[in-house]
Amino acid sequence: MTIMNEGKKRSHSSSSDDHLAKRQYVEHGNECIMADEDIDTAIFEDGIKNNMQWQDTISKVVKAVVSIHFAQVAPFDCDPALVSEATGFVVDSELGIILTNRHVVGAGPFVGYVVFDNHEECDVIPIYRDPVHDFGFLKFDPKKIKYTKIHALELKPSLAKVGSEIRVVGNDAGEKLSILAGFISRIDRNAPDYGELTYNDFNTEYIQAAASASGGSSGSPVVNVDGYAVALQAGGSTEASTDFFLPLDRILRALKCIQADQPITRGTIQTQWLLKPYDECKRLGLTPEHESTSRALFPDRIGLLVAETILREGPSDGKIKEGDILIAINGQRISTFIQVDDILDSNVGNNVEFTVQRGGTDINVTCTIGDLHAITPSKYVEVCGATFNELSYQMARFYALPIRGVFLSSASGSFNFDNKEKIGWIVDSVNYQDTPNLDAFVEVMKTIPDKSRVTVRYHHLTDQHSPNVTSIYIDRHWCSEFRIYERNDKTGIWDYTNVADPISEEPLKPHTAKFIPIPSTNPEIAKLSSSLCMVHTVAAIPIDSLSAETLKTSGLIIDAEQGYVIVSRRAVPHDCLDVFVTIADSIVIPATIEFLHPMQNYAIVKYDPNLVKAPVVTPKLSNRRMKRGESAQFIGYTHNNRLITSETSVTDISSVSIPSNLIPRYRATNLEAISIDSNISPRCNFGIMTDQDGTVRALWLSFLGERQENKEKVYLMGLDIMDCKNVINILKSGKKPQVHIIDAGFGSISILHARIRGVPEEWIQKMEAESNNRLQFITVSRVSYTEETVKLQTGDVILSVNDKLVTEMDQLSGIVHASDENIDSHVLHFKVVRDGKIVDLDMKTVQVDETDQIVIFAGCILQKPHHAVRQAMSDIPKGVYCTFRGESSPAIQYGISATNFITHVNEIPTPDLDKFLEVVRQIPDNTYCKIRMMTFDNVPFAISLKTNYHYFPTAELKKNKDTGKWIEKEYNNSQEIPK
């Protein structure tokens, strides 16, 4: 395929003057005509020669080309944290310098290695990334390359000409080596525009060709037939086969500075210029005199540079205006960006005179050349789970803003302003103190105690006219790090210093609050507003395959004296998080998690009632189950926290099966869900159903389902309060409840299907005689992993448990008891129909343990397989389970995926977290270890992984069983972090 394409392209160049000399001609009079046979022979011979020359060139070029495997390990400025591959090529074999793109080197922390053509691997560090132009340099140690002679490509920017045949040699589409052919079609196009809030090159010409390069080819050399690098592959069009190459003029200058150990000076007047053709310049006011002079001086040029964007408060602000046509600098006529760069870079700190034409008039202005490096951020702050840096020239240029302000490069943690917009925010003030720059921001954050709520004023770069004000929760316990990272171009590492330890939280004070009654003529219904509250959770660490996020819902206060609140487990999925209860939309109080039901989707949290001076009312809870057709009063909170109510009736009570997620995570199982006839309940993520006397009959809860198209599917259903009464009563008595369950999934089948499966007629008659709600049999839909020999099987039809006919799902919901009863398990006698025969089984119940320990290694979160994993798998490997991996971590770079089980490290079995920690703590920094794993489908495989403890230290979070608090401990870290 490649050869055919190259042949076609080469045939277009067979008419060059060099080839004409080799052709044979037959003369007819004064006319010179080429015979058909000679034409074919000449083209064929030229094609062979051209092909052989390219083959010889490519064989040398590939020895200089490297595949770059890298990670930009933290979000910084406009660059996200990511893991990717690209291309580079050696430009100095003695110093070990590799040229690639700036968007590969990145503006922030970089970790990577390169692979040479002979598959030798070598670590690289970044030594330079240009503030504007899309190039950067990596450095490797040439002494570590032992099995091949390092070949460097010579840079020849002057050889990039229109019509030149070129090859792009690189790591196209992630392949080890691809060779793409093309012809240079333009050498004077403006820099491509990649969109807002991302890196863009500007103030330079770009070279255009059609080579159809794709992802992974960034940083590839563009070579001519003589093997010289004439340009640098930088980007391409998504809608055509067009590629964009960066000229090498300024790259060559930067390389010479590095080779001479001299600083690479970069000057700026904070103005963006665009190359515009003469016809457009004339419309902007270019006079015929200047046009004729420029055309005479620069016959190959098609236009002049025109001012596009002038940054406020920059050196040219108020002097140069948009639409000004650049005529000369210091009296030197200008036609290219290269001339501008050369003058500015040589005059940092000096005054330079610019001659521009505005409306047909020549205007001379003097600007002091600024230092481009000084307005390019080289440090960032990490605090409260978010990262910040000074607003950069890159970001400010797009919106013509002054280069100042605190730029939120990762909207997460306490500063997660908008789940949909993660980049582009400017923090104007925190806790009523202005934050004009990063240093001021750091000083403000030093003074704020942990778990405080402070006011933040901020705005988005794309909307300067709409300031935002919100209150945020300061998290310095889950996200305890407060660090300043600074770039070190000598080592390639971003060194960090710890700024300040967390300030202890301030003691809470009690507050008063007033409840607004529910609009109702029934006083018993109206006062139920005093029994409802808001609940929100802040999860900073993703565990149990659940995201780190903030969730909000409502809850029912089931005991005002002790502060118990029942809430959907959708909002309280586990206990590695912070919980808050808001009373009367006025008082926010921290709460503790007292109970998580393993199947029925509810949690119970507890707040300190001494902090609430408000008439909170404990509601009456029903002692009887709801039935189909019953009337009820629905009271619920809408998504915007408005309390609404309406009369309704129960339309159905049936077993439901919530779809499982692709990656197993908590979901409700074995439910008898209540459906109601109401047009307002779909608008409420929490509510209650009551009798007319205010007795609570059921809860209206949100249930987490599967993830579809990157969105969470949430189901809304009712849960009878009777399903919660035993747990509530145990908590009210001052004890801790425990639930023992038969760990299997159940569903329902009709009498017809039960008969087909072999259920005897006598049992069908019993069901018809005793069932009052729905004629159904309960069947086993799936069986969780267990090491017990006696167990249910999928397809079993449940007849009875302990000699009692099973007619409804709640009979299989588990056994609830107080924790002080010390019951390891119960044995239940099941009678089932299996394969058409009645079978008696003595089944042990199990207690579902919540996650109480996690290990963070190489950027992935490891834990014991949680309950959802055991529900989904029939055979669980002996290893630690990966539940999450960081977006720029070694785990992603080397191939650890969520749902993988790590069974061995360096051939040592790791059956549990303690053994895993024992093994990995012996692995030195920046070394490879062998990891054997098992996929979710029990397919074994192995990888090698290189540790990086500077950016990804090993840590453990473990729950103290006595206090209920999570304790963090870091291991083998390159720097100690005070706790």
UniProtKB/Swiss-Prot annotation:
Presence of keyword Nucleus: yes
Disulfide bonds: none
MF terms in GO: serine-type endopeptidase activity
Subcellular compartments: Nucleus
A GO CC term attached to the entry: nucleus
Top EC category: hydrolase
Pfam families: PDZ_1 (PF12812), PDZ_6 (PF17820), Trypsin_2 (PF13365)
Protein name: Pro-apoptotic serine protease NMA111
Swiss-Prot/TrEMBL keywords: Apoptosis, Hydrolase, Nucleus, Protease, Repeat, Serine protease
InterPro entries: PDZ, PDZ-like_dom, PDZ_6, PDZ_sf, Peptidase_S1_PA, Peptidase_S1C
Region (Disordered): 1-20
Role: Nuclear serine protease which mediates apoptosis.
Location, primary (coarse class): nucleus
Designated gene of the protein: NMA111
Superkingdom of the source species: Eukaryota
Keyword Glycosyltransferase among record annotations: no
Protein family: Belongs to the peptidase S1C family.
Catalytic residues identified in the record: 103, 134, 217
PDZ domain boundaries: 273-361, 750-836
